[in-house]
C-alpha cells in the first residue's frame, strides 16, 4: 500500500486489530501491506465473507466441530481456511488449501500466518482434478471420519462430474455452487438447488440449502458421498 488513502485504511485496520486483539485482522493487515494484489478485495468482500460464515455455521450445526483435517479445493486466497481456523467453535488439527493459480499460495500463507507458523495451515498449488483422493485421504478409518473436503468453486469446473467421481464413497463433503451465469469464469452454474443435488448425489445429506445474494443465489450441500 502506498497512497494516502491506503495508509488511512491501514491505520483503521491496525487500530481495530489492537482493540479487538484479533489475530485474523493482524494477518489481513500484514497481507495487505506486503502484497499488491487487487483480488484480495474481492476475496474479502461482504458476499464472499457471508458465504464463508454461512458454511461455517451450517457445518457446525450439521457435522459438528471436531475435524482432524480439512482439504479446501479452489481455496484461492485462503480466506475460508482463516475463517474456520480462527473460529473458536471449531477444533481443527490441520487445513490444506489448494488452488490451481500459483499466485495464491503465498497470499494464502500470509492470510493464515498465525496458523501456518503453528503448523496448522498449509497452501499448495495444484489442479483439484489431478489429485489422487483415494491415496491422499487414506488413513486410519477413525480419523477418516473426521476428514472434510470442501469445494466452494463447483461453478468453475466444466468437467465437474469427472472430479466428483474421483471422491471416495463415504467422504464428508461441503460443496457450494451458484446461479451467477454472468461471470465468464463460471462454466458450471446451476439454476437451482434441486439441480445441484442431482449433480452431487450423497448417501447421507446433512445439510442442503440456499442463500440469496444481491446478484445471485448460492447453493450448498453438506454430507457423505
Q: What do the PLM-derived regions correspond to, one by one?
A:
Residues 83-84, 135-138, 160-166:
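A short acidic, amphipathic alpha-helical/loop segment
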Residues 65-78:
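Conserved class I S-adenosyl-L-methionine
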Residues 141-161, 179:
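A short SAM/SAH-binding and catalytic strip from SAM-dependent methyltransferases
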Residues 92-99:
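Conserved SAM-binding motif I beta-strand of class I
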Residues 158-225:
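C-terminal substrate-binding/active-site "lid" region of AdoMet-derived donor-dependent transferases
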Residues 1-68, 100-148:
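S-adenosyl-L-methionine
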Residues 77-92:
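Conserved SAM-binding loop of SAM-dependent methyltransferases across substrates and taxa
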